[in-house]
Amino acid sequence: MIIPFKASSVKLTSGYGSRILGGKTDFHGGYDLVGVGSTDVTAAVGGKVAVSRMVTDKSNLTWQWGNYVCILGDDGRYYYYCHLASRAVNKGDTVKAGDKLGVMGSTGYSFGAHLHFEVREKNGRTTVNPETILGIPNKVGTYTLPAKSQLERDLDVLVARGVIKTPEYWQQTAPKVQYLSKLIHNMAEALQ
């Protein structure tokens, strides 16, 4: 599961697909999410900032998003983070998963502070159910990340200290080589 906040839990307040809004049936192209314990919005994937702006002109089709960031993901898809109170990135910036993009807000067409998270295919038009990206079920509710293992916590320390760049290689290798897991733990303890 990926939570696009600096939080371990998130509330899904409106899912992907048909919904009733203002008495009318409408198609909702993303998820409306509220971070539990944090309003800092983070990148779900790595990529390049394609758009970082505030839209107030109602003749612009994106005015409903208000203050928003769009990431062109390394996978070629577009990832939208909308209704932000503020933005922490600029067009052209390179981001990695987990980098702060801004702060959750209520700009544009919004009835309260939340993040509208939307994914579009490479053509920029076809929306993707965020469940396939985030692993958060398309059902209103609160979702929490599973607790990290000791190995994952140790790898986080090594990444934060710049000892390793990415934990993926180590996570795949360590279970195969028992002593490697112990080595990683000892390195992390020494750096704390």
Locate the predicted segments by residue.
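Short, solvent-exposed alpha-helical surface patches in non-cytosolic proteins
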Residues: 142-192
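Acidic/polar residues in short coil/turn loops that connect beta-strands
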Residues: 75, 123, 165-167
